[in-house]
């Protein structure tokens, strides 16, 4: 009953307006406001500040600045093996596996189509997926899972439902309904996509090459082509791609048939950390 009420209230909420108001509050540099919000978040979400590069909350200029805090150096070691695909984020590996009949698993008993996720019928190259949920207590920066060159970025406006366990199990096609930013890269295994999925209270998605995109800032699908020689935007495995200004979800899509996950399929909700081995590239 409580879960159904939570879902119902989300349908009533003005998603974009709510998230933009949260964004303004989270961007406030008023010391009293931002320090109070940070203390509340640490207590409410049991945030481990010991891992942060900066542990003095007074040094963060805003609540958002705190939420995208950096980790201490070498806290998340990464494999130098080019055949290892690393986790792009701290969080919970909620679902992963093979894309079958153009469908991905959202939650137990719920599927959604790849075509609806990326808003394109050109889906034939993607064969595997992994979905990582970032809770409010997690490190919020997203890193490159494998060496690659940025070729395209697509912004798709949409709803801003919560992406927690309750909502993913109740709302059909959740990740294809929510606002999302899809980043395409050319890699040694072919094309991959790293998808930032927006959510309720997420005050924006930001990339290191483009900057911040506020919730539903664009009313239509927007595409940026980075494939020309004048851009040549390359990332090494482990490089920072961007971040969420609150908890959300990252989905990775990979091409080819030579990617094998390091976890047993049919298992889910696995705690994972950024740079941890996620999958192997096999011969």
From Swiss-Prot:
Site note Cleavage (non-hydrolytic) applies to: 247-248
The Gene Ontology terms for molecular function here are: phosphatidylserine decarboxylase activity
User: Principal place where this protein is found?
Assistant: membrane
Subunit annotation: Heterodimer of a large membrane-associated beta subunit and a small pyruvoyl-containing alpha subunit.
- What name does UniProt use for this protein? Phosphatidylserine decarboxylase proenzyme
Catalytic EC class:
lyase
Could you tell me the Gene Ontology terms of the biological process aspect for this record? phosphatidylethanolamine biosynthetic process
EC annotation from Swiss-Prot or TrEMBL? 4.1.1.65
Query: In what pathway does it function?
Result: Phospholipid metabolism; phosphatidylethanolamine biosynthesis; phosphatidylethanolamine from CDP-diacylglycerol: step 2/2
Which cofactor(s) are needed, names only? pyruvate
Q: Which InterPro entries match?
A: PS_Dcarbxylase, PSD-B, PSD_type1_pro
| Organism of this sequence | Francisella tularensis subsp. mediasiatica (strain FSC147)
> How does this chain sit within the bilayer?
Peripheral membrane protein
Paste the cofactor note. Binds 1 pyruvoyl group covalently per subunit.
């Amino acid at each position: 009953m409580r879960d159904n009420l939570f879902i119902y209230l989300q349908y009533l909420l003005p998603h974009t307006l709510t998230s933009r108001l949260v964004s303004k509050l989270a961007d406030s540099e008023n010391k009293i406001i931002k320090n109070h919000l940070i203390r509340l978040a640490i207590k409410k979400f049991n945030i481990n500040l010991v891992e942060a590069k900066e542990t003095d909350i007074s040094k963060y200029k805003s609540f958002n600045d705190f939420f995208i805090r950096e980790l201490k150096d070498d806290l998340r070691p990464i494999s130098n093996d080019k055949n290892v695909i690393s986790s792009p984020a701290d969080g919970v590996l909620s679902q992963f596996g093979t894309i079958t009949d153009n469908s991905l698993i959202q939650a137990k008993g719920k599927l959604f189509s790849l075509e609806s996720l990326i808003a394109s019928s050109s889906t034939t190259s993607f064969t595997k997926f992994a979905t990582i949920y970032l809770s409010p207590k997690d490190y919020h920066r997203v890193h490159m899972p494998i060496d690659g060159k940025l070729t395209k970025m697509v912004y798709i406006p949409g709803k801003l439902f919560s992406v927690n366990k309750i909502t993913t199990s109740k709302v059909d096609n959740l990740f294809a309904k929510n606002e999302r930013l899809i980043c395409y890269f050319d890699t040694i295994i072919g094309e991959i996509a790293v998808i930032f999925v927006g959510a309720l209270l997420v005050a924006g998605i930001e990339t290191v090459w483009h900057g911040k995109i506020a919730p539903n800032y664009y009313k239509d699908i927007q595409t940026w082509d980075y494939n020309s020689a004048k851009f040549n935007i390359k990332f090494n495995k482990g490089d920072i791609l961007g971040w969420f200004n609150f908890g959300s979800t990252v989905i990775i899509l990979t091409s080819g048939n030579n990617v094998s996950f390091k976890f047993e399929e049919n298992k889910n909700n696995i705690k994972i950390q950024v740079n941890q081995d996620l999958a192997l590239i096999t011969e």
